[in-house]
From Swiss-Prot:
This is Insulin-1. Heterodimer of a B chain and an A chain linked by two disulfide bonds. It holds the Pfam family Insulin. GO terms for biological process: glucose metabolic process. Keywords: Carbohydrate metabolism, Disulfide bond, Glucose metabolism, Hormone, Secreted. Belongs to the insulin family. It is found in: Secreted. GO terms for molecular function: hormone activity. InterPro entries: Insulin, Insulin-like, Insulin-like_sf, Insulin_CS, Insulin_family.
Length: 50
């Protein structure tokens, strides 16, 4: 899966998809820096799952 820029609702949707029932903790500064300003992978998104 290629890395991509994810911002706003797209970022939340991707986290829901990756984390599923585990849920995720939302730290806007960290994840926006990592996934919106720069492209990030699904593996990087998993770091935000509970």
């Amino acid at each position: 899966i290629s890395s991509q820029h994810l911002c706003g609702s797209h970022l939340v949707e991707a986290l829901n998809l990756v984390c599923g029932d585990r849920g995720f903790f939302y730290n806007p500064r960290g994840i926006v820096e990592q996934c919106c300003h720069r492209p990030c992978s699904m593996f990087e998104l998993e770091n935000y799952c509970n």
